[in-house]
């Protein structure tokens, strides 16, 4: 994970969609029920990604491709490591109904006094949750605790 985190520190934009590739981004080739992101790794590099993280050895056609056992697991671990290095409190909201609305209300109230970071919309799933902390690349590890 340290190698992947070092790459992330140099190229902090994460993408899981080749339509969203920015210069120097890292493309994570996620798999779904009807798609395999490994098929798009070369395209991501062609579009400007600095690296592509893949989990299919057959997809490795370039030295900028990082082979991992599971791309989703690697993304989740990268997010966990990045979040661990940020000295900011976290607030979690759970329940059956109303989580997104509650999150929006709480974040707006807290934003009156604090700098607040929250998931966009309802990206509160196994993919959206790790994409949230890795988007906080402008925060330095162990800064202040004014963020929520």
Language-model region placement:
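N-terminal leader/targeting and accessory segments in enzymes
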Residues: 1-77, 81
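Phosphate-binding loop of NTP-binding sites
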Residues: 75-143
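Cationic, low-complexity basic patches in intrinsically disordered or flexible, solvent-exposed regions
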Residues: 147
